[in-house]
A protein has these predicted regions:
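Conserved small/polar residues in nucleotide/adenosyl-binding loops
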Residues: 193-195
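Helix-loop-strand module that forms the ligand-binding subsite of alpha/beta enzymes
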Residues: 74-146
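Buried hydrophobic positions in well-ordered alpha/beta secondary-structure cores of metabolic enzymes
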Residues: 10-13, 96, 151, 183
Length: 195
């Protein structure tokens, strides 16, 4: 089974990232997970959690925290440039960066890879695989907009975490679930019936 890469950067919106992992695993998907160096601090400040850096300990952390046994979860360090997912020969269904910081987005847009997240995104673009980027920034400046345009021209999908009020959400969880489905539906990984 081809995996889905989830990358979490240091932008705000850790709740969406957590729910994404949970929903994919509950739907028996194979997930390759990369957290950027900055995302650990965001997780601590937004969610009050200390995520282990070591991949095996991190996998067990997520299994326990999200209370999910199904699916396959493989965790990678942000600086592991020799990871299998850094190569085009590692087949995936696609990659979702949620949330995506503007620094990460800018480096991907310019083909500059400092870490495993940026390298994987570059691989997805060069291999013509689905790359879905969920930038979490407001307001946007012209540099942000130009970088988003460059990625859209390179056929990345730009899916900001924008709520849909027409669904009449009753809770924050309803809003988060809508965003998660929006991110992963195009990969055939999850739909509203899976929640």
């Amino acid at each position: 089974m081809n995996s889905i890469v989830i990358a979490i950067t240091g932008a705000s919106a850790m709740q969406i990232a957590e729910r994404s992992i949970q929903v994919l695993l509950e739907n028996n998907q194979s997930v390759d997970l990369i957290l950027s160096k900055g995302s650990y601090e965001v997780a601590k400040s937004e969610r009050g959690i200390n995520i282990p850096v070591e991949p095996n300990a991190q996998r067990e952390f997520w299994r326990s925290r999200l209370n999910v046994k199904s699916g396959k979860l493989t965790c990678y360090r942000w600086n592991d440039h020799s990871a299998s997912i850094a190569s085009g020969s590692h087949k995936t269904k696609g990659m979702v960066i949620v949330p995506c910081s503007m620094g990460t987005l800018g480096r991907i847009a310019s083909g500059f890879s400092l870490d495993l997240i940026e390298r994987c995104a570059d691989v997805h673009l060069k291999e013509n695989r689905r790359l879905i980027i969920s930038p979490r920034e407001s307001p946007l400046n012209l540099i942000h907009i130009e970088n988003i345009k460059r990625l859209a021209v390179a056929v990345a999908s730009i899916v900001p975490p924008i709520p849909a009020w027409y669904t009449n959400p009753k809770t924050i969880e309803d809003i988060i679930d809508f965003i998660v489905v929006r991110l992963f539906d195009s990969l055939g990984a999850v739909s509203y019936t899976h929640l």
